[in-house]
A protein has these predicted regions:
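An aromatic- and glycine-enriched ligand-binding surface/loop that stacks and positions planar moieties
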Residues: 1-153
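Active-site beta-strand/loop architecture of penicillin-binding DD-peptidases
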Residues: 146-177
């Protein structure tokens, strides 16, 4: 196809805003906020096999995976095996996550592009540590919690995605429900 021209882009943006306002005003959907689960609930929406039952007020569209119905995926393999594409986020994307007090990360440090990784992940919107491997990130492997640091052989930028990654490391080479 041909690229959009500026007027078309603005028209589509306005259509999107109008549609979103209708959804918000309908009252059918609400954002999930369980204060006791804030450290995990965002990622849980993408990894919990029962998410479509738990987060019914937030999901507008969801795909439920079910091994009995042969509706599965191999996403874990794509997120941990180098032969599948080496997905990673870049620093500009990570910088869009605010600090926990709502201020931009980029205004917190004069040298924000050169702070160490641990500092970069500290005091941020909790969704950041539910999106990338971070200091302290663990997964379950054969019944034990195991630390998983960012794998620079996989995520060349150091920002290794985890948002959709199952906590069960034994699923990395299997089809996941």
């Amino acid at each position: 196809g041909k690229p959009w021209i500026a007027d078309e882009a603005k028209m589509y943006l306005n259509e999107c805003v109008d549609a979103c306002e209708k959804i918000i005003k309908s009252g059918v959907y609400t954002l999930t906020d369980n204060p006791a689960a804030r450290a995990t609930q965002y990622r849980d929406m993408f990894t919990n096999s029962k998410a479509s039952e738990i987060y019914t007020n937030e999901f507008i569209w969801a795909r439920t995976y079910n091994a009995e119905l042969s509706v599965t995926h191999i996403f874990n393999s794509y997120m941990v095996n180098v032969q599948y594409g080496n997905y990673s986020f870049n620093r500009d994307f990570v910088n869009t996550y605010l600090m926990s007090d709502g201020t931009p990360f980029t205004t917190k440090f004069a040298n924000y592009n050169s702070v160490d990784f641990k500092t970069e992940c500290t005091g941020r919107d909790l969704r950041l540590t539910q999106t990338i491997r971070h200091p302290g990130f663990t997964r379950n492997k054969n019944g034990a919690k195991v630390a998983f640091a960012p794998d620079l052989g996989f995520a060349k930028t150091g920002y290794h995605p985890i948002k959709w990654l199952s906590d069960d490391a034994t699923m990395d080479t299997n089809t996941s429900p």
